[in-house]
């Protein structure tokens, strides 16, 4: 693959990456920070004169990746997890390493890519660890920009680690930044499992290619060989940069919190059963429950002219065998429902479809999945979710605001548990606080230390 081909692949797929990951994060100062750090690292690489493009994506998925042609991406989810400038620099340096070593071009030449549209791969071993930790591989593949995972071989990942550590050291950062961040990701698996609840195994990037302890050990050994005089971590400046950054769902994608989903722009609200865990993505909202039960919310075409009953029969499920097709009304909204059957992840499932006509011509879709032997048990809780769907009042709309990373200085007598009570996210608040700040026990807290919390302010 020529350098012109690499540039073409990057140019063609950059818009697809933006679409898949919520676009650029709307914060010029933070975008500028990521770009300046990236350019500084690129200048220390083997390709300092290449045109590099660094983008902070508006996604809470913890991820970073690169495209051939010098395109490098990090998500705000990754920024929220990192603790120091050195850790972020290590991740960006790793991605630059994939580009300078032409790993994407090598994989393409070997025929291991699922088409040019799949030219971007997760750098950290295909990791998904943020609040959206239940999102499926298919959601990214369908966008076309990330049609595969684990595109890089183990040796290529090792080489990118080595190059990233080298670039980090050249500009004076602590070369242990990569090992620190990989270790943090590895220790995060437990929280992912709790968040995901009963989500199917293999549904996340983390399941597919977790960072191994061997890779962490190797990164530590490489860092020990990198001689840096007075290495910088840049913790304080880094935390000051991300203070106020959105954590979790962005306003444009709605908010999945505490068992309910609310979207200000669409003016909709619905809740899911207590035992289900919600995950939000640019394409849909999913909720996983026990025994492979699941709920999916997404949208159909706008300004459909027929009834919702006709919409199910003639458009949404026109190729399915339907039963119990009927019109219903819920909270003043025209709707229809029908039953069908299908296979999901190799399992036979009963499927309930609900189509809803909303304001401004929107068509909303709720899909309920259950194993046949569990359908009767789940029918009532699924019915409650269906009839919880409604538009919101002006007062409710006004109160909808994103969660943000805020800084807090540890005071005398405070503990992990007491500070965690300040968190706006109540579910697994202690676990989240420990993960955000890299602390495991109260003795890790120091009076006067700055820590991250999640706040509504």
Predicted regions: what they are:
Residues 74, 89-98, 102-103, 118, ...:
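Active-site recognition of the HExxH zinc-binding catalytic motif
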Residues 7-11, 23, 32, 147-148, ...:
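Extracytoplasmic and endomembrane cell-envelope/extracellular-matrix remodeling and assembly machinery
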Residues 416-424, 430-434:
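Short alpha-helical segments in extracytoplasmic peptidoglycan/chitin-binding modules
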